[in-house]
Amino acid sequence: GAWATPIANLTLSSYYGKYADNWNTAYLGSFYKHPLSGQRALSFNLNLYRSTDTGKAKSGEIDTTTWSLMISYAAGAHKFGLGYQKVNGNNPFDYVNRGSIWLENAMQLSDFNGPREASWQLKYDVDLAGIATPGLSAGVAYTRGSGIDNSHLNAVYANYLGYSGVNGKHWERDLLVRYIVQHGAAKNLSLQLRYGVHRTNKAQGEANMNQLRLQAELPVSIL
């Protein structure tokens, strides 16, 4: 893959992946940030995936186009986002490793990647350094998906998932608190507390779930 910055505040990226005898995936992405006066900015993040079966097609016939767009407005410590995501195809948008996709509506408990699914998201993030302590931030996101049609899954996905319903819909709400250590031996250690709630109807196929997750990340410089 490759990325480029052809003009100020615009980043373009393109990648290609192959899962041998299953599918090929091409990715295009763009991010643009438009500065405004007074610590304000408007940004646009677009992601597009195109997946088709390849070789022995062990995952069956695959022909999906999936894209997402997030429009964000930042004002000082506050950031508001409105996102939309769409899957075009009879099968879910699939990938190899969880957490390895750049789609705006990929949440903590669901990726909102069902066949023919359309989803939208509202989110809010705040940097609490000015009113609490440096390194502390929080966020909340709500995503709702609908129009999921599992009635045209290929035989491989139908057997594996066991889904067959139409008019599937679901929603998820995620809360996040993050703290990044500012000084000392543990400097840059990131601690995240995440709480996700997912609710769905029977046709969507996934489970109703509440999940509390504590995550710690410490970057290490090798070179």
Spell out what each predicted region is.
Residues 77-178:
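C-terminal structural cap/anchor segments
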Residues 3-6, 32-34, 72-75, 84-86, ...:
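Residue-level signature of outer-membrane beta-barrel architecture
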Residues 8-13, 37-44, 77-82, 89-91, ...:
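Repeated loop/turn-to-beta-strand initiation elements of outer-membrane beta-barrel proteins
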Residues 122, 175, 179, 208-223:
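Outer-membrane beta-barrel "beta-signal"
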Residues 39-115, 119, 202-207:
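Outer-membrane beta-barrel translocator/channel fold
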